[in-house]
Amino acid sequence: MTGQLVQYGRHRQRRSYARISEVLELPNLIEIQTSSYQWFLDEGLREMFQDISPIEDFTGNLSLEFIDYSLGEPKYSVDECKERDVTYAAPLRVKVRLINKETGEVKEQDVFMGDFPLMTETGTFVINGAERVIVSQLVRSPSVYYSGKVDKNGKRGFTATVIPNRGAWLEYETDAKDVVYVRIDRTRKLPVTVLLRALGFGSDQEITELLGDNEYLSNTLEKDNTDSTEKALLEIYERLRPGEPPTVENAKSLLVSRFFDPKRYDLANVGRYKINKKLHIKNRLFNQRLAETLVDPETGEILAAEGTILDRRTLDRILPYLEKNIGFKTAKPMGGVVEGDVELQSIKIYAPESEGERVINVIGNANITRDVKHITPGDILASISYFFNLLYKVGDTDDIDHLGNRRLRSVGELLQNQFRIGLSRMERVVRERMSIQDTNAITPQALINIRPVIAAIKEFFGSSQLSQFMDQTNPLAELTHKRRLSALGPGGLTRERAGFEVRDVHYSHYGRMCPIETPEGPNIGLINSLSSFAKVNEFGFIETPYRRVDPETGLVTGHVDYLTADEEDNYVVAQANMKLSEEGEFLDEDIVARFRGENIVTNKERIDYMDVSPKQVVSAATACIPFLENDDSNRALMGANMQRQAVPLMNPESPIVGTGMEYVSAKDSGAAVICKHPGIVERVEAREVWVRRYVEVDGQTVKGDLDRYKMQKFIRSNQGTCYNQRPIVSVGNEVVKGEILADGPSMELGELALGRNVLVGFMTWDGYNYEDAIIMSERLVKDDVYTSIHIEEYESEARDTKLGPEEITRDIPNVGEDALRNLDERGIIRVGAEVKDGDLLVGKVTPKGVTELTAEERLLHAIFGEKAREVRDTSLRVPHGGGGIILDVKVFNREDGDELPPGVNQLVRAYIVQKRKISEGDKMAGRHGNKGVISRILPEEDMPYLPDGTPIDIMLNPLGVPSRMNIGQVLELHLGMAARYLGIHIATPVFDGAREEDVWGTIEEAGMANDAKTILYDGRTGEPFDNRVSVGVMYMIKLAHMVDDKLHARSTGPYSLVTQQPLGGKAQFGGQRFGEMEVWALEAYGAAYTLQEILTVKSDDVIGRVKTYEAIVKGENVPEPGVPESFKVLIKELQSLGMDVKMMSSDDTEIEMRDTEDDDDHQSADKLNVEVETTKE
């Protein structure tokens, strides 16, 4: 027997074929959401209040400071919020201090700043009763980016951009004449020396001394028309503010506000970190030849003589001195934008590949501290120096798609940005109020208007592209949605603009973003999924774990380092499947490793790190595909995406052939009930589990408090599937923290269970499985194998109208007693009633416009009291295809104190549950992207059967395998059969699972035939089929594309208002479009009358269709069609262009065209009781 037994949770053992022992547990899979939100509550909010404090009025007399904040308790629990359609939120209170500097008076107050939405334990938000997820956004990190370009003559040049988090951009570029230009905030370009002069380096000599003499600089100086700081400032002002009279002072203040004012220009922590890293002098000195001798200024010791080549070792030796004091100098700009000296670090080197000894200056920005969030003159000088260095092949260009240059904005940061917008709007209001109100009577509460803050947060949660309605089809869909990374959204890319490069798989994605899981279609590559072991660091860069190799001994240690993409570029990383000894020594001399995206074979001394696990490359959903390594990536992509569409079944099964990820995914998804404290189970009911805690007291374990865990029973999920939790522990079980107490939907014994293990044969059967169609045995219908439960919610509200309030009642005009039999005395359907399409759910009447009564009606009214009530029937009825059993009814009344929207007096919700058995037209799939539609459900007795008489469950077309190259399904089939014979479950982790020989070994162990195929007998004749057939157990899932949701038929229904043609689509109860090609078909056939009927009375001949209906009802001949409405519309459009269009008959008389409004078709329709609806498109 190969493989070893592994325990997953309390109830499941699997035989695992993994060869690599995992040194690192999988992290909590929704940590990306929870930790980011926690950071926001702990630090993000505080940062915001510190940034905005103090708000001073225009005189500087009053100052408002935000001291501290606290979050209160939420008003309702999460479940109550879902029921009441309210937001799960807690009140935010801020301590505000108002100081009057004239009188020295200080007032402190706690100000309520609105209800702030809270994250649930499972990483979601409940907004207006619906669960939503905030998706993390992948954006370009603020930094300096250099890139090469080739112009049309083939000349090589460069461009560079300084991108802040918010604020103006600085761009540098070269032109064909080797002049270096700068653009300030996307304006017209200026020679770069103009910007240097504006910073205070006024003369040509100063600039040349600073940057070193080179032809690019002299070309630029020639092009530069300014010769002093003042002129440069005026030149820049004219470019930025054309048409305004320039003065030096205005120019200075403009540049200060554009670049050096922390309120207007923000690099954020990450921008400062990236700029310091990029512009540090050490990166450009590597492997260069010194043109000056480096001396330690403190001791006078020579560290490196002129002409020394700075290799890695020399550079490491002088690095501490570089950090401290070598090459530091202070430039003293005169009259520039920013007063004060500029700290720089400058070292001279010889230009590589230059004839003669050309010396170039390498200038660094002398490591500016992290709290300087705006750009400094030092940064600008260093970035310009880097640009000139690049022209001499010193330094590197940047790859914008590298994950070292793209970062994640998770929930916390997205919320913080939104909160910042709200606070800055509030700041304006506060300033205005400070100047208007009486300074003595003023209070913090009176100054602060919290509306803009609340509005900004509401807008973000309600309508931002990144705040999405949670995909709750099954636990895996839920988990994946929380780990999704989107490059779209505000401040990101748009679908149309994104090219191939952005969407492509990049080598830096390894271990950070899944190369498989991404949608098919226009969003491919723009929406990704976080890899299984990845984490996000403080700057928002994605890190992946690696095992450290001890440089002294060369042994692989258990120590794990998390590396970002740009850190990883400095190391050689070995694969996780390298053979190791017990001590951690590499057993092979030559090792396959990765370095900067290249796969190399190297000796073991060069290895710095090793992968922690083979599945660190892929996401949680992809890691659930067994034999992923044998599938083509396109099909694996479909497999990963389709698992998310699996409908929760009534009695699910976890896969016989799994990957070991099923337990972790289910546990972290938020669908299961997790034990919070260790203890012992005291009581188990369908609705709750009681656990008595264990508490440590003086080294003794004693029983403590009782925890009660409530189950969700038959709740409607966001997608209309059934969300139900079932306990899986028994009384007396000792449970530990983090153990699963109850299964959620699509779970069995604590493991993810999206489908069922069924007996599958690869064979054709009378052509019924042509083109991926699936033939299925009736047993799967009878035994409820693929039966799922669906819950739909319908609501009806009684509003106040201009003519009086609507009323929910049993007394509905023109409705017989038979239709009311399931309504209670209030006119609301009873729970448990079985309803069909068109049945009443809630009886409701709306007042009609009151007409003037005739004398007879007034007399009758006087005699009998109430007149025939002028009300319309606006009851809620079951829509087409919505029939089922009433699961629950909820009634909300304004009088009972329920919060309802304005104008609504009563709200009734009815939940209808449907049990959907599998049927022809339903879509099914395996986990390898092998999808198909059920074409035929055969009686059990007609299905082919095994020699022991067992009929198979499903027949798949063998032609679906070779061209698709998803061989994983065949391996799964055979291994599944062997496992069923052996009565075991199997784990075959991705990239480290069962090899071919393991599968053969297990087949042999199970006593199966040595080709793993079987003789099958035809169920109809009892004859054996000619060839042996591959039969085995495959895991098949039923997808959310069900035929019941798609089937649609219409006789009459709503019509469009303008063209009077039937609407389209099932949602509008529309018709089928008879298009251009269908018309050609009937023309070719010569079916003139059928065609005329389709184009007129069945479509938009308004009078004709009513008369036709009338004729059919009365049993008369169908009359001649009239003029279609769309023809009238055409004539009206031509008339609107000023053409006089008339319609003439064959005898030259004008045909009158009546407008629809004057027609009497509505009256005749009323007599016939035909509904003629018109709908605005």
From Swiss-Prot:
GO cellular component term, pick one: DNA-directed RNA polymerase complex
InterPro entries: DNA-dir_RNA_pol_bsu_ext_1_sf, DNA-dir_RNA_pol_bsu_external_1, DNA-dir_RNA_pol_su2, DNA-dir_RNAP_su2_dom, DNA-dir_RNAP_su2_hyb_sf, RNA_pol_bsu_bac, RNA_pol_bsu_CS, RNA_pol_bsu_protrusion
Residue ranges, annotated region (Disordered): 1147-1177
Biased composition (Acidic residues): 1147-1161
EC code: 2.7.7.6
Subunit structure as annotated in this protein's UniProt entry: The RNAP catalytic core consists of 2 alpha, 1 beta, 1 beta' and 1 omega subunit. When a sigma factor is associated with the core the holoenzyme is formed, which can initiate transcription.
HAMAP family named in the record: RNApol_bact_RpoB (MF_01321)
Protein name listed in UniProt: DNA-directed RNA polymerase subunit beta
Protein species of origin: Bacillus anthracis
